[in-house]
A protein has these predicted regions:
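Transmembrane-helix bundle of Major Facilitator Superfamily
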Residues: 2-169
C-alpha cells in the first residue's frame, strides 16, 4: 500500500497563523477541560448529590475522547478538517454549557461524555490541519507548539479547578 503524499495549502503567513491560533485555543480548552474535574469534581459531586458516581466525571470524558480521536482523524480525511472541527467545537461547547446547567450527577456525567466526544474531535483535527497548512520544514515547530498547548492546558486545569473550589467553599 503506497503512502499518500499530503500537499499543504500555500496560504499567506498571517492567515495560517490566525487559523493555528484558533485551533490552539480550542485544543487548550479541551485539554483544560479534561483535567479540571480532578480538583473541583468532589464539590460538583457533593452539590449534585452523586458521590457514588464521582469517578465517572473524568472517566466519561476521557473514555469518549479516546474513542473519538481515531474516528475523527479518519472522518476529517474524508469530509475535511474545517467542517469536522466546527462540528467538534459545537459538540464540545454545547456539552460544556449543558454541564454547567446540570441538576443531577447523571445529567452532568452525560454532558461530560458529550464534551469528551467534542474534545476527541478537536485534538486530532487540529493536529492534522498542521500538515494541510504548513510546509514539511515548518511542521515540527508547529507540532511542538501544539504539544506545549496540550501540556499547558492539561497543567492549568487542576490549578484553576482548585482555585474555583477554594473560592466556592
Amino acid at each position: 500500500m503506497a503512502v499518500e503524499q499530503v500537499t499543504y495549502k500555500n496560504i499567506d503567513r498571517g492567515t495560517s497563523n490566525m487559523i493555528m491560533a484558533g485551533l490552539a485555543i480550542a485544543m487548550l480548552a479541551s485539554c483544560f477541560d479534561s483535567t479540571i474535574v480532578g480538583t473541583i469534581g468532589f464539590e460538583i459531586a457533593k452539590d449534585l448529590g452523586g458521590m457514588g458516581l464521582y469517578a465517572w466525571m473524568a472517566t466519561a470524558y476521557l473514555l469518549c475522547e479516546t474513542v473519538m480521536i481515531p474516528v475523527a482523524g479518519k472522518l476529517s480525511d474524508i469530509y475535511g478538517r474545517k467542517i469536522l472541527f466546527l462540528i467538534g467545537l459545537a459538540i464540545f461547547t454545547g456539552g460544556s454549557i449543558i454541564a454547567g446547567l446540570s441538576v443531577s450527577m447523571e445529567m452532568f456525567i452525560v454532558c461530560r461524555a458529550i464534551q469528551g466526544f467534542g474534545g476527541g474531535i478537536l485534538i486530532p483535527v487540529a493536529m492534522a490541519a498542521v500538515a494541510d497548512l504548513f510546509a514539511p520544514s515548518d511542521r515540527g515547530k508547529v507540532q511542538g507548539l501544539f504539544g506545549a498547548v496540550f501540556g499547558i492546558g492539561s497543567g492549568i486545569g487542576p490549578l484553576i479547578g482548585g482555585y474555583i473550589e477554594g473560592a466556592a467553599s
